[in-house]
């Protein structure tokens, strides 16, 4: 199932500030929803290195901002797109 353009835009508006705060060189590319509507795939890129981050769609809807940022940070660190925590 496809996300509506409005939903994609709202997800982008919510995620971009977190990505920029973690690393200003990270770029949000696209967001997709899996066929079972369980996971969001968030495609980001740093320099010439794209990566896909996974967010539980149901959890994302009600996830507090601090938890969302921590989730993004952890996945980016595992993928070696950012260094140690910037807290």
Where are these regions (language model features)?
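Amphipathic, interaction-prone secondary-structure segments
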Residues: 17-51
């Amino acid at each position: 199932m496809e996300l509506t353009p409005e939903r994609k835009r709202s997800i982008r508006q919510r995620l971009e500030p977190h990505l920029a705060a973690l690393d200003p060189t990270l770029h949000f590319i696209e967001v997709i929803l899996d066929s079972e509507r369980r996971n969001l795939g968030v495609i980001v890129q740093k320099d010439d290195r794209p990566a896909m981050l996974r967010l539980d769609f149901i959890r994302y809807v009600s996830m507090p901002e601090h938890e969302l940022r921590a989730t993004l940070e952890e996945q980016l660190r595992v993928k070696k797109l950012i260094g140690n925590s910037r807290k």
